[in-house]
Amino acid sequence: MFLFSRKTRTPISTYSDSYRAPTSIKEVYKDPPLCAWEANKFLTPGLTHTMERHVDPEALQKMAKCAVQDYTYRGSISGHPYLPEKYWLSQEEADKCSPNYLGSDWYNTWRMEPYNSSCCNKYTTYLPRLPKEARMETAVRGMPLECPPRPERLNAYEREVMVNMLNSLSRNQQLPRITPRCGCVDPLPGRLPFHGYESACSGRHYCLRGMDYYASGAPCTDRRLRPWCREQPTMCTSLRAPARNAVCCYNSPAVILPISEP
């Protein structure tokens, strides 16, 4: 193991068997060599003076002669790859020989890009596509909505709205009477009695099964119509009173309980 001194840089051994006499290291200063000229390493190579090369005039003439012969030979061959205009086709030849179309269908192409080929296009029309910003809202507006089929009979709310509309119209002109079809006066086989009531506003009798009123004023003729009954049906019970005001109130019977007599 050697320990070096910073001053003398002399290795000092810690072992007695490896001891040697200390010697100092001296650095001798030498003057740079005197040179009249040295190459500038930072000079751009392109700016240096080029040496004149010897050019053989016979070899230069031979190269020019070979170039002329090669150009003449290439121009004499029809359809040579160096003349690509030989392969250019007119529009008529392209229409006849182009493999991009099948038969006479201009839209039946081999292009398999999305929405570019009619053979794999989910849109069956050839009209131009809508702009991207208006495509979604236009598609949503024109999309058919799956609505349930409209029932033949109106529900309680629709019946009440229709009654109020008829009452508002009856103030200006006389409307035909609504023929009631209650279960008590029109007992059809397989049907339970329904609740019919008289409106205090219009003074008419309404049946909750359905209204036999038409815009033309003539009731349906194929139905079995019964005369207007002025009493409340005895076989039905309502848990809530009928509508009090046809204009402001949309009350309808909440629960209808058919009562069977023993």
From Swiss-Prot:
Disulfide bridges in this chain: none
Gene Ontology cellular-component terms listed: axonemal A tubule inner sheath; cytosol; manchette; mitochondrion; nucleoplasm; nucleus; perinuclear region of cytoplasm; sperm midpiece
InterPro entries linked to this entry: SPMIP6
GO molecular function, one term: alpha-tubulin binding
Pfam families hit by this protein: SMRP1 (PF15181)
Listed GO biological process terms: cell differentiation; flagellated sperm motility; protein-containing complex assembly; spermatogenesis
Keywords (A to Z) from UniProt: Cell projection, Cilium, Cytoplasm, Cytoskeleton, Differentiation, Flagellum, Mitochondrion, Nucleus, Spermatogenesis
Broad class of the protein's primary localization: cytoplasm
UniProt tissue specificity: Expressed in testis. Strongly expressed in ciliated epithelial cells with lower levels in goblet cells (at protein level).
Induction summary: Down-regulated by IL13.
Compartments it resides in: Cytoplasm, Cytoskeleton; Nucleus; Cytoplasm; Mitochondrion
Quaternary structure (record): Microtubule inner protein component of sperm flagellar doublet microtubules. Interacts with alpha-tubulin.
Function: May participate in intramanchette transport and midpiece formation of the sperm tail. May play a potential role in somatic cell proliferation.
Stated family: Belongs to the SPMIP6 family.
UniProt-recorded name of the protein: Sperm microtubule inner protein 6
Provenance organism: Homo sapiens (Human)
Organism classification: Eukaryota, Metazoa, Chordata, Craniata, Vertebrata
Gene: SPMIP6
